[in-house]
Amino acid sequence: MSAQISDSIEEKRGFFTRWFMSTNHKDIGVLYLFTAGLAGLISVTLTVYMRMELQHPGVQYMCLEGMRLVADAAAECTPNAHLWNVVVTYHGILMMFFVVIPALFGGFGNYFMPLHIGAPDMAFPRLNNLSYWLYVCGVSLAIASLLSPGGSDQPGAGVGWVLYPPLSTTEAGYAMDLAIFAVHVSGATSILGAINIITTFLNMRAPGMTLFKVPLFAWAVFITAWMILLSLPVLAGGITMLLMDRNFGTQFFDPAGGGDPVLYQHILWFFGHPEVYMLILPGFGIISHVISTFARKPIFGYLPMVLAMAAIAFLGFIVWAHHMYTAGMSLTQQTYFQMATMTIAVPTGIKVFSWIATMWGGSIEFKTPMLWALAFLFTVGGVTGVVIAQGSLDRVYHDTYYIVAHFHYVMSLGALFAIFAGTYYWIGKMSGRQYPEWAGQLHFWMMFIGSNLIFFPQHFLGRQGMPRRYIDYPVEFSYWNNISSIGAYISFASFLFFIGIVFYTLFAGKPVNVPNYWNEHADTLEWTLPSPPPEHTFETLPKPEDWDRAQAHR
């Protein structure tokens, strides 16, 4: 994506200086989005390979005799369980640490949060540059880990993305150590970004922009930054203990030496459950702006929406052990975590019903971003989450495909759909060129149908008792697995089509000649700027009359 060059010094910058040494928040946001897209392509490819293997009973592709891309019934195939575990592990690690948070928080957050509050840039521009390049190092370490010697004398670490001991402490090779370092570096870049976001939000708002006149996306990114700042150091401590157990003879998680592997589960999930909301809260902000724009109405209940996000963030820190009902806990503990978990449905419901109220009576325009917002099926994942909040039911569904379906309705049809909504909503603003509407809508329908075909049948597989993370299964599970795999192929084709749409838009899309190419209800400050925005924005700070009429939330 290009940005307008405002003076002769900037015109002399080459490609390397512009993109590798930039401290401009807009350039860094674009870099985050581009790198997250590459990591996402790798992760989605691993997903398709998993679904190829699971389409039919028996092992056809992941063989000890060698990986295959075409099934050969006549050739011998000894199941390669390590390869399967590696594919599952790196799909999770890449998606959780290197795709969704960097795209929503690092990409859209860096680009639009300063614009929404009228700030010239981030508070610490050089720190912003450092956090991006640490992110690149983290992605590189993760890919290096995938290709490095691991267990069973094969590449990669096959322990699952949660890195549970004793699997992670006994896995041979240094692929496991590189994976832990990759997560460490990912945490460092997120913490640095969070410090920058918090400082910018609190200190660089436009004159007269009080806290409760800040747009919802900026609020979402700000609250997410606090969650990152409070939870990631806990994970850092846990995986540091893993490294110590692996390399320095400590026994934090080894029962033979007085350690406790369940301690790691508490550490991981104290970070892991807030992470779910770190992934989804920026998406909430994007969806709020998209719905308000295309319903042609101000968002309903602005203040309750802000308070609901803050409540979700707070409650996210006190429900972690609902992931651990089967690890053993007292009835009193289980009762508390059940009640606390179900309480999160209240602020989440406030957001969902506020979106519905915003659309009610509005003049809805079904452009591509609005389609993604309407298909934002986080609610389905939330409803199934209330189901498995019950300890008695969770004992039945734990480690079955019901959990896979629940989680991916939150992540894939939640956070990922929010990324697509934000991309189509803002790509014209970022690039100065607009996507073809027919192509965006075709991509939406392909992805919507494909994603639901993947994950909705997995609820049935879970109810039938199919365990997750298995390379093979009895023939009784074949019907829904076949449908799920067909959905994966459709979704993968739609993702490749999306990449084509992005490149077509950047190089041949219809030029955007107006600041606001949607309507008057796209009312945040970026819509007062040219498309694309100039290299330096708000060198003269916006006055209240520039934004207050549009931001008068009551």
UniProtKB/Swiss-Prot annotation:
Binding positions (heme a3): H406
Topology relative to the membrane: Multi-pass membrane protein
Catalytic reaction equation(s): 4 Fe(II)-[cytochrome c] + O2 + 8 H(+)(in) = 4 Fe(III)-[cytochrome c] + 2 H2O + 4 H(+)(out)
Binding site for Cu cation: H273, Y277, H322, H323
Superkingdom in the source lineage: Bacteria
Binding site for Fe(II)-heme a: H91, H408
Transmembrane annotation, as ranges: 26-56, 81-118, 127-148, 175-203, 215-248, 260-295, 301-319, 331-359, 367-390, 399-425, 436-463, 478-508
Cofactor: Cu(2+); heme
Classification via CDD domains: Cyt_c_Oxidase_I
Molecular functions per Gene Ontology: cytochrome-c oxidase activity; heme binding; metal ion binding
Pathway: Energy metabolism; oxidative phosphorylation
Alphabetized InterPro entries for the sequence: Cyt_c_oxase-like_su1_dom (IPR023616), Cyt_c_oxase-like_su1_sf (IPR036927), Cyt_C_Oxase_1 (IPR000883), Cyt_c_Oxase_su1_BS (IPR023615), Cyt_c_oxase_su1_dom (IPR033944)
Disulfide topology: C63-C77
Keyword tRNA-binding: no
GO biological process, one term: electron transport coupled proton transport
Free-text remark on how the cofactor is bound: Binds 1 copper B ion per subunit. Binds 2 heme groups per subunit.
Enzyme class: translocase
Record location of the 1'-histidyl-3'-tyrosine (His-Tyr) cross-link: H273-Y277
A single cellular component GO annotation: plasma membrane
Alphabetical UniProt keywords: Cell inner membrane, Cell membrane, Copper, Disulfide bond, Electron transport, Heme, Hydrogen ion transport, Ion transport, Iron, Membrane, Metal-binding, Respiratory chain, Translocase, Transmembrane, Transmembrane helix, Transport
Subcellular location field: Cell inner membrane
Function (record text): Subunit I and II form the functional core of the enzyme complex. Electrons originating in cytochrome c are transferred via heme a and Cu(A) to the binuclear center formed by heme a3 and Cu(B). This cytochrome c oxidase shows proton pump activity across the membrane in addition to the electron transfer.
Family assignment from sequence similarity: Belongs to the heme-copper respiratory oxidase family.
Stated name of the protein: Cytochrome c oxidase subunit 1-alpha
Gene transcribed to yield this protein: ctaDI
